[in-house]
Curated annotation (Swiss-Prot):
The modification Omega-N-methylarginine is found at R85. InterPro entries: RAMAC (IPR028271). GO terms for biological process: 7-methylguanosine mRNA capping; RNA 5'-cap (guanine-N7)-methylation. Keywords: Acetylation, Methylation, mRNA capping, mRNA processing, Nucleus, Phosphoprotein, RNA-binding. Pfam families: RAM (PF15320). Residues 57-70 have a biased composition (Basic and acidic residues). This is RNA guanine-N7 methyltransferase activating subunit. It comes from the Eukaryota. The gene is RAMAC. It comes from Pongo abelii (Sumatran orangutan). Regulatory subunit of the mRNA-capping methyltransferase RNMT:RAMAC complex that methylates the N7 position of the added guanosine to the 5'-cap structure of mRNAs. Promotes the recruitment of the methyl donor, S-adenosyl-L-methionine, to RNMT. Regulates RNMT expression by a post-transcriptional stabilizing mechanism. Binds RNA. Belongs to the RAM family. Interacts with RNMT; this interaction enhances mRNA binding and cap methyltransferase activity. A motif (RNMT-activating domain) lies at residues 36-42.
Amino acid sequence: MTDTAEAVPNFEEMFASRFTENDKEYQEYLKRPPESPPIVEEWNSRAGGNQRNRGNRLQDNRQFRGRDNRWGWPSDNRSNQWHGRSWGNNYPQHRQEPYYPQQYGHYGYNQRPPYGYY
């Protein structure tokens, strides 16, 4: 095997005309018509939202309900996993201790904030 120092100049020589007018394979590729993108139908059929053309499938699907009778996979315990926390943000809704933005900010050195500030 060759050293890395020797291989780099070899690659530079091998690919010097790559993707240029001298690259016959690349020029043939450019002449081809563009391919159409793949079409995937009903890729989100389980996710809800657009519910047209689904027939009676959504009316009585009790086998897909979890333990707590909510919609989801069988026995999916999402409500138990989140313990009442919202999904959207991680901002603490109920603080355990008071929040002071600066060490000795608006309320001075030895003053507590009003009761509803928590």
